[in-house]
């Protein structure tokens, strides 16, 4: 084992997650933590890991950006023909992880993923910068390309043909993960970390403390 890696260690203990600090609604608890991360101007505070599973039970994970959340779910946008899109098409269950090391906090969220309505995808698509819209329209995400130059050429050709006025491609849009489980993790001294798990039972949220 690499001894240098074994020496990498950070002691936690800046904050706590006690019974009095826990909100009974996990969406409210998420909002409190998320807004604190944003207020501290943490880089990419809305970055999250999305884990999906393929039809042959191979998991994969990648970093995405959260674009909206409410009690209906957590929203992100991508190419429907990407690996994650194909995974979701066959297995609608996934997991999200938010990690804010500066706050010594992590949130895990599990649930079912569904596509957003076309009008919601359209609204966000046209809010994006023109370059991002073009990239979403031309990139054959998760497929092999010859080189980067070929991708730039596709982008230039698309711009020459369509200019700045074009519709959202049918293969690109939004998803929403509707949670049935949350886990809030707060780093504590001596690795006796706080873990609070929320589960949805009979349409009501219940929470319990887990051992670290």
PLM feature spans:
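Binding-site signature for planar aromatic cofactors or substrates
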Residues: 1-212
């Amino acid at each position: 084992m690499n001894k240098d890696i074994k020496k990498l260690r950070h002691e936690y203990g800046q904050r706590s997650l006690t019974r009095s600090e826990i909100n009974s609604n996990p969406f409210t608890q998420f909002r409190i933590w998320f807004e604190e991360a944003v207020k501290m101007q943490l880089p990419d505070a809305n970055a999250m890991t999305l884990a999906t599973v393929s039809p042959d039970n191979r998991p994969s994970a990648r970093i995405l950006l959260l674009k909206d959340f409410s009690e209906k779910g957590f929203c992100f946008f991508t190419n429907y023909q990407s690996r994650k899109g194909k995974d979701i098409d066959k297995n609608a269950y996934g997991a999200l992880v938010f990690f804010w090391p500066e706050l010594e906090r992590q949130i895990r969220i599990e649930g079912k993923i569904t596509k957003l309505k076309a009008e919601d995808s359209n609204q966000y698509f046209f809010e994006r910068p023109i370059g991002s819209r073009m990239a979403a329209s031309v990139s054959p995400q998760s497929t092999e390309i010859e080189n980067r130059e070929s991708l730039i050429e596709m982008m230039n050709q698309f711009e020459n043909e369509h200019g700045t006025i074009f519709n959202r491609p049918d293969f690109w849009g939004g998803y929403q993960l509707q949670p049935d489980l949350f886990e809030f993790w707060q780093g504590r001294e001596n690795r006796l970390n706080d873990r609070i798990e929320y589960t949805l039972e009979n349409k009501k949220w219940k929470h319990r403390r887990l051992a670290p």
